[in-house]
C-alpha cells in the first residue's frame, strides 16, 4: 500500500508541474514576479506630491505619487519607464 501512495503522489506532482509550468513562463511574469508594467498607476497612501511615470499599456505617462506605498509601476523618469516597459 505504501508504494501505491508514493506513486500516486509522484504522478500528481508531475501532472501539477506540467499544468502550471507554462503559466510561470507566460508574458505576465518577469524573473518570477508579476510584470510591473501591467499594473495600474497607484498614487500610494501618503500625501506628498512627486512626479513619477507609469506604463499605461501603450506608453509612459506622468502621474503624481504620494511618496509611499503604491506598486512597482512607477519610475523616476520617462526614460527609465520606457527602458523597463517600452517593449511590454
From Swiss-Prot:
Keyword Cell cycle among record annotations: no
Cysteine-cysteine disulfides: 37-85, 46-68, 60-81
Signal peptide coordinates: 1-27
Residue ranges occupied by any BPTI/Kunitz inhibitor domain in the UniProt entry: 37-85
Tissue: Expressed by the venom gland.
An individual GO BP term: envenomation resulting in negative regulation of voltage-gated potassium channel activity in another organism
UniProt GO MF annotations: potassium channel regulator activity; serine-type endopeptidase inhibitor activity; toxin activity
Places the protein is found: Secreted
Protein's UniProt keywords contain Nucleus: no
Site (Reactive bond for trypsin): 47-48
Domain of life: Eukaryota
PROSITE patterns named among the record's database cross-references: BPTI_KUNITZ_1, BPTI_KUNITZ_2
Chief location of this protein within or outside the cell: secreted
Prosequence residues removed at maturation: 28-33
UniProt keyword list: Disulfide bond, Protease inhibitor, Secreted, Serine protease inhibitor, Signal
Pfam families recorded: Kunitz_BPTI
Function: Serine protease inhibitor that inhibits trypsin at a molar ratio of 1:1.
Family as reported in the entry's similarity comment: Belongs to the venom Kunitz-type family. 02 (native) subfamily.
The protein, known as: Kunitz-type kappaPI-theraphotoxin-Hs1b
Amino acid at each position: 500500500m505504501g508504494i501505491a501512495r508514493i506513486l500516486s503522489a509522484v504522478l500528481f506532482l508531475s501532472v501539477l508541474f506540467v499544468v502550471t509550468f507554462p503559466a510561470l513562463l507566460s508574458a505576465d511574469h518577469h524573473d518570477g514576479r508579476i510584470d510591473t508594467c501591467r499594473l495600474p498607476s497607484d498614487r500610494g497612501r501618503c500625501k506628498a506630491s512627486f512626479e513619477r511615470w507609469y506604463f499605461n499599456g501603450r506608453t509612459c505617462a506622468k502621474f503624481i505619487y504620494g511618496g509611499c506605498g503604491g506598486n512597482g509601476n512607477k519610475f523616476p523618469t520617462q526614460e527609465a519607464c520606457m527602458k523597463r516597459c517600452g517593449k511590454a
